[in-house]
Amino acid sequence: MKRRIYIPFLISMLFSLLLFSQNFTPIAFDLAAPIDVNLDANGTPWVTQSGSGANDGLVQKVNPDGTKETIIEGLPSYFDFMLEELQGPLSTQVMADGRIFVCQGAGPDSLSQTIMEFHWDDYVAKGAPLVAADRRGTIWHGQWVLANGFDESNPYSFLIDGDGNFLISDAAANAIIKYNVNADEFSVLTEFPSFQNPTPIGPPFVQVVPTKILAHPDGGYLVSSLTGFPFLDGASNIYRVQKDGTTSVYASGLTLVTDMDWDPNDGELVALQFAAFGPVDTSFSFIFNSAQLIKVAETGGLDTIAAGFGPSPGLAFAADGSAYLTHLFLGQLLKTDPLSTPVFDLGKWQPKPMVVFPNPNDGRFTTNIFLEKPTEVTYRLTDLLGREVATGQVGHLPAGENAVPLDFSNNVGHGAYQLSLNAGSEWFVTKVIFK
């Protein structure tokens, strides 16, 4: 894949504040570009975060009371301004014996494109977050990939098979790479070829980008995929990959699948669709609240079981059938009620638009909102990484049309931001540009 996945979305997307029903509850906040969520042997979620581009990638454990415990910090995190991409850690697996494996994505650091091994015992003994220098071992995945005919490497996820070998999904090489631990040897298990672009928009061929790899109960593996630009609806597949590399389509008709897991209630596969791509404001981008959870039958049938959230790249099921989901742009970890076949759709809670004048501006502007009833109004301003820049009280406003003057000229830099106003059960969102 010529462009790293996810982080172009940070720059190109007009994102807004998500509203939650009783079925979706945020349980952790202020996460730094959360990608993956993985559960340990106790069912506790661990969240892999790509950071902000300042070598601040990290892995945190989210305790039942919502507190975050930083286990590993200071991992390579780099923002490429030319490509508009954030590059950092992408996934983590926590083993029952205390080993912690972190999959580090693409980037310029010497530890980019590797899988690093840490250990829980070292964290306990240190009494402080581990750093890269505390690692016990390194799988130099990217070095081998780049030396063996591939232009790029971006290890996204991995699994460890029954023999202790690693199957690595590379989202830039568009291949599954096998690492034999005992022999210290790499090999290509399978590659995913591009297909002809059926539209006049974008490049002549669309890349097939592998994301999550899972073991299939009957042997072999399942590999989810997303497609490159123009991010076509229904063009993503889940593939069945046998141990000899034989590859076939397991399920089709999906869109931008970034993760998948097994539903513990019925044993069926559930795929996470990151978001849909379409018209946003005056341009095309990834549509807020358009992520979906899709139940995938063994026969390939698809059934939507949750919708109206995200963009969300990471999924993990708890033992009771509730799902943990990362929200990339709001920097949150969500948890659902135990899922069943009825669709949980949050579409009716979509935020309302509001008008800002002037826009662009110097940080001083007026926004107009219409309130159904008198209520207290608060504001929240976030940057393009979803980080909170400013919050405050607007005050008690009457029902009807209201002009709300705001002034961020003294404490906010130039650039594009997301402004959200909360008025009780009503939410208003817009994009503002400070020049």
Write out the residue ranges for each language-model feature.
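Short, solvent-exposed loop/turn segments at conserved positions within beta-propeller repeat blades
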Residues: 51-56, 108-113, 171-172, 230-235, ...
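Beta-rich, blade/repeat-based domains predominating
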Residues: 30-42, 56, 77-99, 136-166, ...
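C-terminal tail/sorting-segment detector
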Residues: 5, 391, 396, 405-435
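Residue position within the beta-strands of beta-propeller blades
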Residues: 46-49, 101-103, 168-169, 222-224, ...
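Beta-propeller fold detector
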Residues: 25-28, 68-76, 125-141, 187-194, ...
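A short loop-to-beta-strand structural motif that recurs across blades of beta-propeller domains
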Residues: 55-61, 113-116, 175-178, 236-239, ...
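Surface-exposed, proline-anchored Ser/Thr-rich loop/turn motifs
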Residues: 344-372, 382-387, 414, 431-435
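Short loop/turn segments that connect beta-strands within beta-propeller blades
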Residues: 62-67, 118-123, 180-184, 241-246, ...
